[in-house]
Amino acid sequence: MEPQPATLWRSEADSRIERLRKGDLVVEVRGHDGALVKDARVQYRLKRHEFLFGTAIAYSPFADTGEDGRNYRQFILDHFNALVCENEMKWYATEVEGEGVDYAPADALLAFAQENGMAMRGHCLFWDKLQFVQPWLAALGRSELRAAIERRLTDIVTRYAGRLISWDVNNEILDGGFYGQRMGPDGTAWMFREAARLDPKTPLFVNEYAIFGESEKTERYLDLIRDLRARGAQVGGIGVQLHDSDRLVVDGKMTLAPAGRPEWMVSTPITAESFIATLDRLHGETGLPIQLTEISAMLPDATRRGDILEMIFRLGFSHEAVHAILLWGFGEKTHFLGPDAALVNANGALNAAGIRISHLLREEWTTRGDGMTGTDGRLAFRGFYGKYEVVVRAPGCEAVRELRLTKSAPSAALDLPE
């Protein structure tokens, strides 16, 4: 199938965004006596999207007390409403030697998220690849390993219960196998069941890479979810990574990174149509919400990098089953794929890719405006779903309020003080 022209896939995505991510809100202004107030000036601006746009955050650059640290934190505050710890909640980070657990870095990052009204994903309870399993853990026998897993689950799940929007339970199972080989075919399902018992309210996710453009692996992913559910696992969502996004066909061509491309990256082209078709299939056959959990684009040309990231964001934001899109880092000095994956240069300035994403999040996909109430005391506007700051000015008084625009709340009353 030939890829769609950019103007076509983009216009179709934008139409879906307009339909799925925006709504009409009627603000009704009343005086302290309950009377409707006409000719009141109402200013409104979106403070926080309902949809989650986020990034992985790492403790070392976050805690930097110099200019680099300030730039790192400010870019996050300026652009995102969701975070995920890049490594700090992983078992190999919290319990390096099997003697004592350190949650201080993860606690600090979660506190930062909560202080700034950001959601936090939990990543990850376990990682199924042997190279990411601590030597002391890999050396345990089966019964000892099970006991260690139980202790890990009880410790970290209860510690963060009610404070996370999701947990990745066993990361990258399809290309892993450590826990499956050691614990048997029910091992991962047991992890899900135990995590759900310890924290019934936090959705539990699977999380895999190389799904887009790979029909065979998509089928394996669906088989995994079916098997987990058949074993009583409460799978609450599907995580989809995309680090090898240089495979995306943009403007009719694919531009693979010329050098330094990790061997685990695949090279099958991804068109806009196949991207949407994969999301359709994952959601259609499971009914589960989807989060684009780890997004990167590694190319030396920052403009082309921006083209690819914009395509991912626009397509993901336009799909009804996708609830979140998270970059896996952004800084030239800190990105795990190196400078060719950065949005922010070493001096803190946005490069062409960063400018593109910043424009989407702070200009194109935001809502701000003002107007006057009519004789019925009402002002109507259309905007993105989320939290708004509304300022109302009428003769002799001014009020600042927070309102939420949701599909279930198309109107809001605002009472002025005496």
Task: Tell me the role of every PLM-derived stretch.
Residues 26, 48-107, 112, 118-119, ...:
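N-terminal substrate-binding region of glycoside hydrolase catalytic domains
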Residues 386-396:
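A short, solvent-exposed beta-strand micro-motif common in secreted/extracellular proteins
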Residues 1-61, 91-95, 121, 183-186, ...:
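Beta-strand-rich domain onsets/edges
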Residues 95-97, 101-105, 132-202, 206-223, ...:
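Active-site cleft segment of glycoside hydrolase catalytic domains centered on the general acid/base Glu
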Residues 52-54, 82-84, 117-121, 164-168, ...:
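Structural preference for beta-strand elements that scaffold enzyme active sites
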Residues 27, 83, 113, 156, ...:
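Conserved, mostly hydrophobic/aromatic
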Residues 364-376:
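Short, acidic Ser/Thr/Gly-rich low-complexity loop/linker segments typical of extracellular
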Residues 294, 300-301, 305-340:
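Substrate-binding cleft of secreted/luminal carbohydrate-active enzymes
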